A protein has these predicted regions:
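Substrate-binding pocket helix/loop in short-chain dehydrogenase/reductase
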Residues: 95-96, 100-108, 201, 205
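Residue(s) in the substrate-gating loop at a strand-loop-helix junction
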Residues: 139
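Alpha-helical segment proximal to the catalytic Tyr-Lys
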Residues: 124, 168-172, 232
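Short C-terminal tail/terminal secondary-structure segment
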Residues: 2-3, 144, 224, 235-246
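Conserved glycine-rich cofactor-binding loop
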Residues: 18-19
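Active-site helix of classical SDR
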Residues: 119, 155, 163
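A conserved structural motif in NAD(P)-dependent oxidoreductases
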Residues: 208-219
Length: 246
């Protein structure tokens, strides 16, 4: 009997694999036996992630998925998939009264349009196998109402709705769709946040997390759960991961 978290023989697409959660997810998924297709915009960092993958048969495809024409070409390069981990995305910390249309379009193109139309393209081209699993990486921002996150939180809330609908529309093909919604995780983004504000403010924010900030491993392990047979009876779920913050 195979282990319920074993991904051997499965092919998983991981977007945003050049850094942070996407990078760790790609590495962790390969450690569980999967063949991984990794995507990111920076070819050098993508190659570095590729060098860290365990096993053989992996594929790296550099592309900016926020651009429609690029998405179509990207989908055409993909093999049949057993799962997708949508880890790519951008953040924006900016007061509501100063938000503009350019910011809105850029954030929604990366955080909503890219995962939506990549998933649609993969499904319509029959590259998403029956029984596959889709995982969207959202955020606690829609739940927490964090100041300065109006555009970002809206984009991540959209993923909740999309995932929930896909859970019903794709159930006939036994394709599952779920979200993971992390709080602050110790990635390059958090390090940049500390420089943007101050280490003292970061410490104050972390104190709001009963279990402290998370690590990329924490989120990657949850994504593996949703990609693996262990969660075969779970779909349409949004898993909040924030160490008790909300």
């Amino acid at each position: 009997m195979s282990h319920p978290f074993d991904l051997t023989g499965r092919t998983i697409l991981v977007t945003g694999a050049t850094s942070g959660l996407g990078r760790q997810t790609a590495i962790s998924v390969s450690e569980m036996g999967a063949q991984v297709v990794i995507n990111g915009r920076n070819e050098e960092r993508l190659a570095d992630t590729f060098s860290k993958l365990e096993g053989e048969g992996h594929l790296a495809v550099s592309a900016d998925l926020a651009v429609g024409e690029t998405r179509s070409a990207f989908v055409n390069k993909l093999p049949p998939l057993d799962g997708i981990a949508h880890c790519a995305g951008v953040t924006l910390l900016h007061p509501f009264k100063f938000n503009d249309e350019r910011q809105f379009r850029e954030v929604y193109a990366a955080n909503v349009e890219a995962p939506f139309f990549v998933t649609q393209g993969v499904f319509k081209s029959k590259r998403l196998k029956p029984g596959a699993s889709i995982v969207f990486v959202s955020s606690i921002s829609p739940h927490a109402g964090l100041k300065g996150h109006a555009i970002y939180a809206g984009s991540k809330a959209a993923l909740h709705g999309i995932s929930r609908v896909l859970a019903h529309e794709l159930a006939g093909s036994k394709i599952r769709s779920n979200c993971v919604s992390p709080g602050m995780v110790r990635t390059e983004v958090v390090a940049g946040f500390a420089h943007q504000v101050s280490p003292e403010l970061v410490a104050i924010d972390e104190a709001r997390y009963p279990l402290g900030y998370g690590t990329p491993d924490d989120v990657a392990n949850a994504i593996i759960f949703f990609l693996a047979p262990a969660s075969k009876w779970i779909t349409g779920v949004d898993l909040t991961m924030d160490g008790g913050r909300t």
